[in-house]
Regions:
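Short, flexible catalytic-loop segment of classical short-chain dehydrogenase/reductase
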Residues: 47-57, 62
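Residue(s) in the substrate-gating loop at a strand-loop-helix junction
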Residues: 2
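Extended, polar beta-sheet/loop recognition surfaces of beta-rich domains
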Residues: 38-49
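Active-site-adjacent segment of SDR/Rossmann-fold oxidoreductases
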Residues: 7, 28-40
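A transmembrane-helix-recognition feature enriched in membrane-embedded lipid enzymes
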Residues: 83-118
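C-terminal helical subdomain
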Residues: 44, 61-97
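Active-site loop immediately N-terminal to the catalytic Tyr-X3-Lys motif
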Residues: 9-13
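Active-site helix of classical SDR
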Residues: 18
Length: 120
């Protein structure tokens, strides 16, 4: 998934909504596995910007600094092995996720729109 799955995404609606789908699907599967007392464990990774070729291909720029793919992968594996379900690497991304939860959606949408518009 992505941190984008936790908030509305004006000007990148398809991307944000696809990440929200992955997040909700993972939450549903986790509950099904728990109810069946399965030994199968899953996690959902919600990084912010990751330093990959995605930026060039999608033609986007990120306001936050990106983490290396190596850092994100190591962080994800370490936290998965600790039994964490929702894995969010980086302090600033954790803050953004928290703020998006306590802020009304219409305000989050306005902020996201402004951030996306600035990237053009």
């Amino acid at each position: 998934s992505s941190i984008a799955g936790s908030m509305p995404g004006p000007l990148m609606c398809a991307y944000y909504s696809s990440k929200a789908y992955v997040l909700r699907l993972s939450e549903g599967i986790r509950e099904e596995l728990n109810k069946k007392k399965s030994n199968v464990k899953i996690s959902v990774l919600q990084p912010g910007p990751v330093n990959t070729n995605f930026n060039n291909v999608a033609g986007v720029k990120f306001n936050l600094s990106s983490k290396s793919s190596e850092y994100v992968a190591k962080y994800a594996v370490e936290n998965f092995l600790k039994g964490k379900f929702n894995i969010v690497p980086g302090f600033m991304i954790k803050c953004a996720k928290f703020l998006s939860k306590i802020t009304p959606d219409f305000l989050v949408a306005k902020v996201c729109y402004h951030m996306q518009e600035k990237k053009k």
